[in-house]
């Protein structure tokens, strides 16, 4: 099993899909990386050579992934809460942030119904 950025990539999947197991790398980023390195996206992870894996590791160093990205997102939300903007207050209250109505729905953000 190939280990990149502290994540074990699934051996039986195509490289294009396997790279999406890394937080912050989606299909588009994965395809862009593979095209730049000249690696066939249909290759299975288990068939990658050690040199190809090291090339992928070096290319991923240019991307914000895993812990760094999670920390960055958390710091952005924390900053919104600290400056007491509307979005920050919605984060604090656990309500939808992007303008959705909450009269009937938003159960995911609001949690289970509270009995009166």
From Swiss-Prot:
From its record, what is one biological process in GO terms? Answer: translation
- UniProt protein name: Small ribosomal subunit protein uS13
UniProt cross-references to Gene3D superfamilies, sorted A to Z: 1.10.8.50, 30s ribosomal protein s13, domain 2
Family classification: Belongs to the universal ribosomal protein uS13 family.
Organism expressing this protein natively: Finegoldia magna (strain ATCC 29328 / DSM 20472 / WAL 2508)
Q: Which PROSITE patterns match?
A: RIBOSOMAL_S13_1 (PS00646), RIBOSOMAL_S13_2 (PS50159)
A GO term from the CC aspect: small ribosomal subunit
- Region (Disordered) residue ranges read 88-116
Q: What is the lineage of its organism?
A: Bacteria, Bacillati, Bacillota, Tissierellia, Tissierellales
* Gene designation per UniProt: rpsM
Provide any one GO MF term from the record. tRNA binding
